[in-house]
Amino acid sequence: MGRTREAGCVAAGVVIGAGACYCVYRLAWGRDENEKIWDEDEESTDTSEIGVETVKGAKTNAGAGSGAKLQGDSEVKPEVSLGLEDCPGVKEKAHSGSHSGGGLEAKAKALFNTLKEQASAKAGKGARVGTISGNRTLAPSLPCPGGRGGGCHPTRSGSRAGGRASGKSKGKARSKSTRAPATTWPVRRGKFNFPYKIDDILSAPDLQKVLNILERTNDPFIQEVALVTLGNNAAYSFNQNAIRELGGVPIIAKLIKTKDPIIREKTYNALNNLSVNAENQGKIKTYISQVCDDTMVCRLDSAVQMAGLRLLTNMTVTNHYQHLLSYSFPDFFALLFLGNHFTKIQIMKLIINFTENPAMTRELVSCKVPSELISLFNKEWDREILLNILTLFENINDNIKNEGLASSRKEFSRSSLFFLFKESGVCVKKIKALANHNDLVVKVKVLKVLTKL
């Protein structure tokens, strides 16, 4: 029974030692925060071996009972292997502890001391468990999982340090594997380390760097990050001027032509923030017709369309550039009828900007509109839509009176906005029906409109 008990204690000590080795391995692997875990195709028979190799020096001789020993501070290559057959020092101490009758605690302590010596030797030389020898390279461009721009998956250009690459093993002789080497994981590109965070508030030199990156790259991932960074900085007035002075508006606006809807959306968002500045509007006006055309033909209710409508709304807050969009009035009203709730609200804000400019009244009321537009005056719509459509009607009605267009009704067709709002009488009936609306704000707005009729 004595030898059986002794063998059981040795086995328990080996299990504890293996666990401690794994902990040392995990801690050493986590020391380098800038390195990623490299995915490798390992054979199932080699999972117990992990080699440790320092930058310079000679290998230590892990003799019986001595464990891993340093032969010099700068010229040592300690080799640590986690298999029992490759750890004679660990075995020796475990057996010596069992012969002395120290029990399970003594054996575990002996194992821990040996591992501690090996770990301290490794830490002193800055070695890394499971490192890969040779240079790291990036595979050529192919799509990879994990995101739009793709992470980078390094490939190996050298042999694995440790048990398999050391040439000689300390245990049984191992036959060479006949298995063909695994192919490297193809990636689209290396991950680009953008120099700034997207929410950083940048100075003029930093903005110049971002603009240079945006101008030179064709990578959609980098373009998106750069546009978001510029758009966030354009929310601040001092950076609105800086981006314009650095020639940033043409650099950003050239991406309107890209086919990628995400890039176009980010481009419109950046230009939208820049358009708050009156001087920037003078630069953006060159592209306003192009933005309008793209907004009308892109997918209905898409994020690109909403971003384009927001930009057009900002550009028409003043009267300076409204005439550049007068050719699109029929498209605006068609979109008002076809769009979803959010598109309807945004397009009504855009049209209201035109109704506040009396000089645009004639072109506005003479355009053709769908007769179904009258359905927007139904009480089933929510407050925001009703308030906007009532404001639109109020402004047009006031402008018709102020511009004296009521006497020129013959020049407007039956499909025009003038006929729908002024001559048909259907619109007035719909508005009167809203006088009993449950929402007090809507009811007050209806009464205000009716008093002006």
From Swiss-Prot:
Main localization category: mitochondrion
Cytoplasmic-side positions: 30-453
Recorded GO CC terms: mitochondrial outer membrane; mitochondrion
Positions of the UniProt region annotated as Mitochondrion outer membrane (MOM)-targeting sequence: 1-6, 26-36
InterPro entries registered for this protein in UniProt: ARM-like (IPR011989), ARM-rpt_dom (IPR006911), ARM-type_fold (IPR016024), Armadillo (IPR000225), Armcx_regulator (IPR051303)
Protein name (database record): Armadillo repeat-containing X-linked protein 1
Family: Belongs to the eutherian X-chromosome-specific Armcx family.
Subcellular location: Mitochondrion; Mitochondrion outer membrane
Transmembrane listed as a keyword: yes
Tissue-specific expression: Expressed at high levels ovary, heart, testis, prostate, brain, spleen and colon. Expressed at very low levels in liver and thymus. Not expressed in peripheral blood leukocytes. Not or reduced expressed in lung, prostate, colon, pancreas and ovarian carcinomas.
SUPFAM superfamilies: ARM repeat
Subunit annotation: Interacts with MIRO1.
